[in-house]
Structures are given as structure tokens and as C-alpha cells.
Regions:
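Long, compositionally biased intrinsically disordered regions
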Residues: 1-3, 29-34, 60
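Short alpha-helical segments that sit at the start of domains
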Residues: 1-15, 42, 62-64, 68
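Residue-level detection of the helix-turn-helix DNA-binding "recognition helix"
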Residues: 20, 46, 50
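Alpha-helix N-cap/helix-initiation sites
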Residues: 5-8, 23, 38, 56
Length: 68
């Protein structure tokens, strides 16, 4: 596994743990909690959504990410 895949895998795990702790969160909330840059957070969120671990919901014009 190359370095990029290892880093992304670690980011995905860290993001999942963060979401489990804080519950539903906005993109900005997750950035503050993880200190991820936009691209890193997007890739980790996409991976978790692809694996059906997280879903995206619009509540009162705000997009939230929520553990399934």
C-alpha cells in the first residue's frame, strides 16, 4: 500500500471516530474537529458514504453528515 493510501485510510478512520463521538456534523464542524483540509475531508467523507457508513442530509438548508 502506498503512502497516500495509508494516509487516506488513517483519515477515514479518524473521521469515522470523530463522527461517532460528535454525532451529526456540518462540513465546517468536521474540519474544526479533525483539522483536515478540504480535499482530505472530502475524500474521507466520500469513502464513508460509498461504504454506507455515513449519509448526507439537508436539514433547514444546512447539510449534515450523520452515522448510519
Amino acid at each position: 500500500m502506498n503512502t497516500l493510501n495509508v494516509k487516506l485510510s488513517h483519515s477515514i478512520s479518524q473521521l469515522y471516530e470523530t463522527l461517532c463521538q460528535v454525532g451529526k456534523s456540518t462540513f465546517a464542524d468536521l474540519q474544526r474537529a479533525t483539522n483536515f483540509k478540504d480535499t482530505e475531508l472530502c475524500l474521507a467523507l466520500c469513502s464513508l458514504m460509498h461504504d454506507n457508513k455515513v449519509y448526507q442530509a439537508r436539514i433547514s438548508n444546512t447539510v449534515y453528515y450523520i452515522i448510519k
